[in-house]
Amino acid sequence: MSQMDPDAVSKAFVEHYYSTFDTNRVGLAGLYQEASMLTFEGQKIQGVQSIVAKLTSLPFQQCKHHISTVDCQPSGPASGMLVFVSGNLQLAGEEHALKFSQMFHLMPTPQGSFYVFNDIFRLNYA
């Protein structure tokens, strides 16, 4: 397998993650594994089913993420990647967008793609 450009991989991942979140949250299940952990506004959730249950139970049906920045670094000897995202979250029917930050720790799969090992999400109230 050729060496992948971390910036290109992280950009493609971010585009896929948020377009899926905005249109079909259940479809995010394939990006997590049983060892994956989500910390959502301080609440720690582990495992695919629990993470998807949390994301699909959020109190809004429609939203649109607008990404401002994507930063990435290689992480550790297992060819993982840290991806840090900031942007705005526009909820349907709301006038003002919410600022958010999200960090993903991506780990490679044997099939040559990546899964989300860690995911930390925070709204930025400032």
Swiss-Prot record:
CDD domains xrefs: NTF2 (cd00780)
A GO cellular component entry from the record: nucleus
Superkingdom of origin: Eukaryota
UniProt domain NTF2: residue ranges: 9-123
Keyword Cytoplasm attached: yes
Location(s), subcellular: Cytoplasm; Nucleus; Nucleus envelope
Keywords annotated in UniProt: Acetylation, Cytoplasm, Nucleus, Protein transport, Transport
Gene Ontology BP, a term: protein import into nucleus
InterPro entries, sorted: NTF2, NTF2-like_dom_sf, NTF2_dom, Nuclear_transport_factor_2_euk
Tissues where the protein occurs: Expressed in roots, stems, leaves and flowers, and, at low levels, in siliques.
Modified-residue entries (N-acetylserine), positions: S2
Role played: Facilitates protein transport into the nucleus. Interacts with various nucleoporins and with Ran-GDP. Could be part of a multicomponent system of cytosolic factors that assemble at the pore complex during nuclear import.
Subunit comment: Interacts with RAN1.
Protein name from the UniProt record: Nuclear transport factor 2B
